[in-house]
From Swiss-Prot:
ATP binds at S16, L17, G18, K19, G20, I21, D73. Keywords: ATP-binding, Glutamine amidotransferase, Ligase, Magnesium, Metal-binding, Nucleotide-binding, Pyrimidine biosynthesis. L-glutamine binds at Y56, G357, L385, G386, M387, Q388, E408, R465. HAMAP family: PyrG (MF_01227). Transmembrane segments: none annotated. This is CTP synthase. CTPSs have evolved a hybrid strategy for distinguishing between UTP and CTP. The overlapping regions of the product feedback inhibitory and substrate sites recognize a common feature in both compounds, the triphosphate moiety. To differentiate isosteric substrate and product pyrimidine rings, an additional pocket far from the expected kinase/ligase catalytic site, specifically recognizes the cytosine and ribose portions of the product inhibitor. The active site is at C384 (nucleophile), H510, E512. It comes from Flavobacterium psychrophilum (strain ATCC 49511 / DSM 21280 / CIP 103535 / JIP02/86). The keyword Ligase applies. One of its GO terms (cellular component) is cytosol.
Amino acid sequence: MNQTKYIFVTGGVTSSLGKGIIAASLAKLLQARGYRTTIQKFDPYINVDPGTLNPYEHGECYVTNDGAETDLDLGHYERFLNVPTSQANNVTTGRIYLSVIEKERRGEFLGKTVQVVPHITNEIKERMQLLGKSGDYDIVITEIGGTVGDIESLPYIESVRQLVWELGENNGIVIHLTLVPFLAAAGELKTKPTQHSVKTLMESGIKADILVCRTEYELSEDLRHKLALFCNVKREAVIQSIDASTIYDVPNLMLEEGLDKVALKKLDLPEKSTPDLKQWNEFLQKHKNPKHEVSIGLVGKYVELQDSYKSILEAFIHAGATNETKVNVISIHSEFLDVNSADEQLKGLDGILVAPGFGGRGIEGKIETVRYAREKNIPFLGICLGMQMAVIEYSRNVLGYTDANSTEMNQNTSHPVINLMEEQKTITDKGGTMRLGAWKCHLSENTLAHKIYGQSDILERHRHRYEFNSEYLEVLQKAGLKASGVNPETGLVEVIELENHPFFIGVQYHPEYKSTVLAPHPLFVSFIAAAVKHKNK
């Protein structure tokens, strides 16, 4: 292919309809037909990136290989496509305006009055085409965050209108995702909200090429025809997206509806071969027909909102399918867990994961959880802060350093077993200043970590400011807490494990970010296998 083709996905009626899942499913089908496909997300908030956003506000912050702190939808893109994303795959209004203002300060606009049109829209269009111009992709799918009609989304909608016009016929299309609600009182599905949403889009100068309708019930042929007529699309371009039991069903549902065929036809591209979803369907088969079942305790401080730990929950699904095991995740709030309630809240679990996080709230509950898992020989996995809590717990309860802590929680502790990284000590800004992205780690032979990975050198993604204090390495190792993985350049301890425990491992990095449908993360796979073994013992 000479020219990259563009697909824009907008949403109407309400937020949280699943634009990211539809975009990822379409990308999966196009990829399975042999097209090099990527997805990017444009978010209309003024934060430069989601790195400083409260997880309750926006869910998990997803970190890419190149160290970008991005929207959790990029996690879906990677899990579906098994292809890494980068900073270029996620753009916010904050980043757009920051770039334009910096250009103005440098005098790049030659004294012109800087306006939303053309300066902001030009910046948006430039970034929309960045991945396409790299030559690496045949098709770029762009998801526009928010809902059509929102004030925040207007510059993006205008940019899409201009870009579709500039690209020319068959080079750019718009998919509009909308809701067809069921009205119980009338006992029928209603198309009016969709009609109004499409009308709002048309008022902005954009005609939807394909309509994807989220619905609880099947759309009748009459209803599809009505939507096609009033929304000005072809009948075959009215696509039903019925509620599914798992998001991993959606590519098959879209294949049945012919979404990929309609998109290719409108882009004037050949269908090539039938999508090869063999491995995908093998995963689904295992996921839906488990032979085992385990209960895993997810101990964290943001458990009220499931999206806060989205990648961890998805990694459990991937690892569960590999082990032909149904993984029941029990969310446990670390703030409400202590010595007195630990047994009541944690007994009966087949494995315990202590989640990442920041700040002092709920820390003592996490430390108590580690003690419980260690003493009761329950399979344990600690991620980032969870690994740090394991070091603190061992220092307190095995070495007898009763006030051992992280300087993040207590700057005056006499045993700072977790300390602020040296390069972080001069940093004052919060945004984008942590140790981020993929870093090397060397695993020692004859360790659990080496056995899990089956290799000595790995690359994992990080997001932290604090680290294992190497001054305590020797004394902790002598006491049985092994540092089985270190950064080969800095000596930073990345992995810790217990020798005399069936499965006890803590990692400073975030393995959940790299787990995908076709490549489940070995740490999660081994953790679930250990949980199955523990249950059957």
